[in-house]
């Protein structure tokens, strides 16, 4: 049993890397936030499906908050600046934005795939967890639980370690 859990965790770590690189780094960050290139619909759809597993909540919220971050990097208005919301809330990704100004998300609401995920992320997350657990608790560990933990802590580490100096590095979106 311990070997099965260990293998599930190892597979979950590898799966987390796929989600992190394809879904978060390429799709959310470079494609949506910075509009650096175009991707085919299949690439976008698979990437969004991966992100729903990692519980980033709504992709529109993630993208808009990241755009806010770039406009106000490490200063007032940055939704995940340690100086504004506290080290532990940033580290464990428990910060919250009361209201995101529409200027950061207006273009995103033109994308039906993003809008679908925005409206249904909670139901998708519950379904992913229930179905994967019913398949097997080990499958759930690898497919859903480990990526969830890695996403929460990974984004938190990126935002605490990557912005520990005054001003941080900022590239306009």
Cite the ranges covered by each PLM segment.
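Hydrophobic alpha-helical segments that either span membranes
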Residues: 160-161
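Active-site-proximal inter-transmembrane loops
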Residues: 111, 165-173
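Non-catalytic, topology-defining segments of multipass membrane proteins
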Residues: 1-157
